[in-house]
Regions:
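Stable alpha-helical elements in mature extracytoplasmic
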Residues: 75, 79, 112-116, 137
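Alpha/beta-hydrolase fold catalytic core
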Residues: 2-61, 85-87
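Glycine-rich, phosphate-binding/catalytic loops in enzymes
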Residues: 78-82, 106-108, 148-149
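Conserved HGGG/HGGXW glycine-rich cap/lid loop of the alpha/beta-hydrolase fold
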Residues: 47-99
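Conserved hydrolase catalytic core segment
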Residues: 126-163
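Active-site loop/oxyanion-hole signature of alpha/beta-hydrolase fold enzymes
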Residues: 94-132
Length: 163
């Protein structure tokens, strides 16, 4: 009798588990359009990097996210949506964030800057830029301004880290 009850409970558990798995796959199919990249995926150092742009102003604002910003495009949306009528807005998602690839390579300031510049070039976005760094990307911005002053028109810090 006990074995029969255990078998019944096990069958019920398996049916419930299968129902949850089926529901999960159905929801994934329904949500598939929501997982499409919001910007364009460009190649930088052999990997895909996400670059989002909108607006058509004369000046280009490039938003750079800090550490641990999982989706920079969505994170900055409340700000850039107010500015896109007057400026060209660009949001670069670093490797490992948003829709960009996760890579296994050094993430020092020089390589992050190199990847950002490569992504901007691949997306056909030319300077000079108004860089809008948040948090840790402030270090990358100062490094960029030192190495490539002709590419930086201005820096507008968004609670950025400074050396």
């Amino acid at each position: 009798m006990k074995k029969k009850k255990r078998l019944i409970y096990l069958c019920i558990e398996l049916v419930v588990f299968a129902a949850f798995i089926s529901w999960h796959y159905i929801q994934l199919k329904i949500e598939e359009p929501l997982r499409a990249p919001l910007g364009q995926l460009v190649e930088a150092d052999g990997h895909h990097m996400s670059v989002y742009s909108e607006g058509a102003g004369d000046k280009t604002l490039v938003f750079l996210s800090g550490s641990e910003t999982t989706s920079p495009i969505l994170d900055f949306k409340s700000l850039y949506s107010l500015l896109s009528d007057e400026y060209k807005i660009v949001v670069v998602e670093r490797f490992g964030y948003g829709f960009s690839d996760v890579v296994d390579k050094p993430r020092d300031i020089a390589s992050v800057l190199s990847d950002t510049r490569a992504a901007l070039a691949a997306a056909d976005i030319s300077g000079p830029y108004v860089l809008c760094p948040h948090s840790l990307s402030g270090l990358e911005t100062f490094y960029c301004a030192q190495l490539y002053p002709e590419e930086v028109e201005a820096i507008v810090g968004l609670d950025m880290a400074v050396p």
